[in-house]
Design a protein with these regions (language model features):
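Secondary-structure end/capping motifs
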Residues: 192-280
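Conserved C-terminal helix/tail region of periplasmic/extracytoplasmic solute-binding proteins
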Residues: 267-311
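A generic structural signal for nonpolar/aromatic side chains embedded in well-ordered alpha-helices
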Residues: 4, 52, 156-159, 225, ...
Length: 311
């Protein structure tokens, strides 16, 4: 989205000035979306939209930002497998669970561990970098944590082991088809009142994704990241060094070039939220999705700039 603004892709669609706001927390994004302070959430956890939809709120997932960003669950030396997490503490970034929590809950459940009764979740664990998490793991704040997708794989696995920890699972291996962790969402009134503008917004976003995916734009993306105020000290949840910035830029490959959501993964998320007790058993992810807009947008971008990566 930032690339779309910087490169004038929204202006190309005849849209008025588009402003990007970094709220810093998903619940703040949701509050702003509900109140009308923002019209689109470009980086929201899908489960939050599901929960709102199940309560009758007219919020919809339009497309994806991230379908399958890597996430590595690591454990202290005494935790050699997911099964060893029974009775242990697991760190997470936010109250209510950060991006990787639904995935970790799936892993626990598969190992026969109740994610609500047999482990303790410790919020505000900080950014998932090894530099930040090593001292917290060493002093026993928790025994497992998810590391950011902005490290190179498989190189990070060796770094984890050299630090004395164990690699317990990797999201891209357990869910190779993708597990959507960040989505684009809006309200029903926006869809009803401004359908053409919705497609134009999505076209701008898709072009921005494709620009970021193009490796020849690495230095321009780096400059954008370093120039923008992300609303959190240290560009993230703490120290964010050059290695992680390189990984952040490289992770653009996980932006979907058609803006679409991996529906199999989205269904996995919905099923975990049901098991979590956050959604009714009869909930269907389709009731909180409107993919027709992003499909039209992708078709128009392909027609104008070339499929599947033209921008």
């Amino acid at each position: 989205t930032l690339a779309a603004i910087e490169n004038g892709y929204f202006r190309d669609e005849g849209l008025p000035e588009v402003e990007l706001t970094a709220t810093g927390e998903d619940h703040l994004t949701m509050d702003a979306l509900r109140s009308g302070d923002i019209d689109f959430g470009a980086d929201v956890k899908p489960g939050m939209i599901f929960e709102a939809s199940s309560k009758g709120e007219q919020l919809y997932i339009l497309g994806a930002m991230i379908n399958g960003l890597p996430s590595t669950l690591i454990g202290t030396p005494d935790v050699k497998s997911i099964a060893d997490l029974r009775g242990k503490k697991i760190g997470c970034k936010e109250e209510g669970g950060s991006r990787e929590v639904p995935w970790i809950r799936m892993l626990l459940r598969k190992a026969g561990i109740d994610p609500d009764k047999e482990v303790q979740w410790v919020p505000h664990a900080g950014f998932g970098s090894l530099d930040i998490q090593k001292p917290r793991l060493d002093r026993g704040d928790y025994q497992a944590i998810g590391l950011t997708g902005h490290y190179k794989r498989p190189e990070i696995f060796d770094l984890v082991r050299e630090a004395g920890f164990n690699v317990l699972a990797e999201c891209t291996e357990t869910h190779p088809y993708g597990l959507p962790s960040r989505v684009i969402a809006t309200r029903s009134d926006i869809l009803a009142d401004y359908p053409e503008q919705v497609v134009k917004v999505l076209k701008g976003i898709i072009r921005g994704y494709r620009f970021a995916r193009d490796k020849k734009n690495v230095e321009r993306i780096r400059h954008m990241y370093l120039s923008y105020d992300w609303g959190k000290d240290g560009f993230g949840w703490g120290k964010f060094d050059a290695t992680l910035l390189d990984g952040q830029i490289a992770s653009a490959q996980y932006l979907p070039p058609d803006g679409g959501v991996v529906e199999r993964g989205l269904q996995d998320i919905a099923e975990e939220y049901k098991a979590w007790g956050k959604l009714p058993k009869n909930f269907s992810y389709e009731q909180a999705t409107r993919f027709d807009f992003v499909r039209q947008a992708a078709q128009e971008v392909d027609a104008a700039y070339g499929a599947p990566e033209g921008y």
